[in-house]
């Protein structure tokens, strides 16, 4: 177990322009392997002019939130809150649950330690899920993990969530990369006040610039999240494109097969270069 607090800006992947400045003589075109974004993006549909010229209304939000609940196979009573990407929720969660002891299952996406540390919370990075089962006020699991793909079994998370509920603790589960492996998802736990599940839109659909993500939670947590986000938390064009994509099961099924095939091909290419596999991307699709 390690105490951890980050106070500096984090350098994320996907910064092709910065890389080109550092390595101006590198061969082109660049192949960006620095992010977990699907390189085969959902085709942008035609957007009605009103999506640009008007503020998004309540119906636009309720439509996409209903579509997300269905797409993620969440319980009917689960509340869904749309935001400008999962990062928007990461930024506000320390304000909703302030000055807490926060346990993070590491090594993982560093923005969690950064944002909670900046809120004067005491942050500890733990090495196993069992170490989260103690007197933390907030526990955070990224599942599958970013960046190494580590997966925590659904049953382990369910047991931990039950104990968090008994102790009135908060468990945050970031499922930004779980779309192709729904059998590992904890969305069935979102009726508990002690659980918030975060889901990314842009990564799987290859549209991170759209800035769209969702929190799945209980009614109590929905009220807290909406109050913290404020009105019009997502743009009209993002709501329109997201609704179209989430309502297109054929595309997501084909994308899952394509990504699995591409992952296998990449593994073979790297194996030919005598590279070492740190984690397997070959999990049977559900």
What role is predicted for each listed range?
Residues 16, 30, 61-65, 157, ...:
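A general structural signal for well-ordered alpha-helical segments in protein cores
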Residues 33, 171-172:
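Residue-level marker for buried hydrophobic side chains located in beta-strands
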Residues 194-271, 275:
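PLP-dependent aminotransferase class I/II
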Residues 45, 111, 147-149, 205, ...:
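Short glycine-rich, flexible loops that bind phosphorylated cofactors or substrates
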């Amino acid at each position: 177990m390690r105490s951890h607090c980050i106070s500096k800006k984090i350098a994320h992947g996907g910064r092709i322009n910065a890389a080109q400045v550092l390595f101006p003589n590198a061969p082109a075109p660049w192949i960006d392997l620095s992010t977990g974004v699907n390189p085969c993006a959902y085709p942008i549909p035609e957007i009605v002019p009103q999506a640009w010229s008007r503020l998004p209304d309540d119906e636009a939000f309720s439509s996409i939130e209903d579509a997300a609940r269905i797409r993620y196979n969440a319980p009917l009573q689960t509340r869904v809150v749309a935001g400008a990407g999962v990062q928007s929720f990461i930024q506000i969660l320390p304000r909703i649950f302030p000055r807490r002891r926060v346990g993070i299952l590491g090594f993982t996406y560093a923005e969690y330690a950064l944002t909670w540390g900046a809120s004067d919370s005491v942050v500890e990075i733990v090495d196993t899920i069992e170490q989260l089962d103690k007197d933390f006020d907030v526990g955070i699991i990224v599942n599958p993990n970013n960046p190494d793909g580590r997966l925590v079994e659904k049953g382990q998370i369910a047991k931990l969530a039950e104990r968090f509920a008994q102790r009135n603790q908060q468990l945050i589960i970031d499922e930004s990369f779980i779309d192709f492996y729904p059998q590992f998802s904890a969305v069935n736990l979102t009726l508990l006040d002690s659980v918030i599940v975060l889901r990314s839109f842009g990564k799987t659909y290859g549209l991170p610039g759209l800035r769209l993500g969702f929190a799945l939670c209980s009614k109590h947590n929905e009220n807290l999240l909406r109050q913290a986000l404020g009105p019009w938390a997502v743009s009209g064009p993002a709501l329109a494109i997201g609704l179209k994509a989430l309502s297109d099961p054929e595309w997501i099924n084909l994308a899952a097969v394509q990504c699995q095939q591409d992952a296998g091909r990449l593994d073979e290419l790297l194996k030919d270069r005598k590279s070492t596999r740190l984690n397997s991307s070959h999990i049977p699709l559900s």
